[in-house]
Each structure stands twice: as C-alpha cells, then as structure tokens.
Amino acid sequence: MPTIQQLIRNQRQPVENRTKSPALQGCPQRRGVCTRVYTTTPKKPNSALRKVARVRLTSGFEITAYIPGIGHNSQEHSVVLVRGGRVKDLPGVRYHIVRGTLDAVGVKNRQQGRSKYGVKKPK
C-alpha cells in the first residue's frame, strides 16, 4: 500500500489490457499465404496429430494457425483467411484458418455445425 506522499509523487497507472491476437492488428480477419503445413502433437494429457500451418500475413507477421475440421487441402503457397482464437492444447497457436474461403475448402460430408467449417446446406 503506497503512502499519500508516494501517490502525490507519481499517480497510479491504469492497467492496459493486451490483445490476444496481435498479428491481426485489430482486424477481424487477415489474409495470408501458407509457408509450411505440418502436424504437431498437443501437450499433456492429450494425444493427437493436430494440423497446423505457418502463415505469412499481409500485416507482415509470420504466425502459426490451426486448420480445423477433418481433412484439408491446404499446402504451401495456399492463400488462406486467418481469424483469432487459440487452441488450448497447442502452445503458441493463437489463430484459426477460416474454412470455406479463398483456397481453404469446406469440410466434406459435414452435417452439423456447418457454418463453422464453410459447408453449404445439402440439397
């Protein structure tokens, strides 16, 4: 607890909240080009091969983005749309690739939660 004299000398500084997705620079999404597409393993206690991509954004940042859904067509030089949103069991992955836009196609045979995976309504 500061003394009154200390508060007179220098005021309390307001706490500034930091953004969780700095590479987007306040934009809802950003376009980028995949530089590397690979799989990585989650931290304990989970076990899987999660599909991720290194993406160079138009803002100049090089980020790691998660590719959601079952199966994907992303490869090197694919142009993708990136949104914020971390993957809890992959350290350092703070972005998601948006399926169904640009070069990332929607998930095949998806019936439920289609809007999150870029799938049109089946006939």
From Swiss-Prot:
GO MF: rRNA binding; structural constituent of ribosome
Keywords recorded for this protein, A-Z: Chloroplast, Plastid, Ribonucleoprotein, Ribosomal protein, RNA-binding, rRNA-binding
Superkingdom of origin: Eukaryota
GO BP terms: translation
Cellular-component GO terms for this entry: chloroplast; small ribosomal subunit
SUPFAM superfamilies: Nucleic acid-binding proteins
UniProt cross-references to CDD domains, sorted A to Z: Ribosomal_S12
Localization per record: Plastid, Chloroplast
Pfam families: Ribosom_S12_S23
Keyword Phosphoprotein: no
Family according to the record: Belongs to the universal ribosomal protein uS12 family.
Subunit structure: Part of the 30S ribosomal subunit.
Its biological purpose: With S4 and S5 plays an important role in translational accuracy. Located at the interface of the 30S and 50S subunits.
Protein name according to UniProt: Small ribosomal subunit protein uS12c
Native source species: Huperzia lucidula
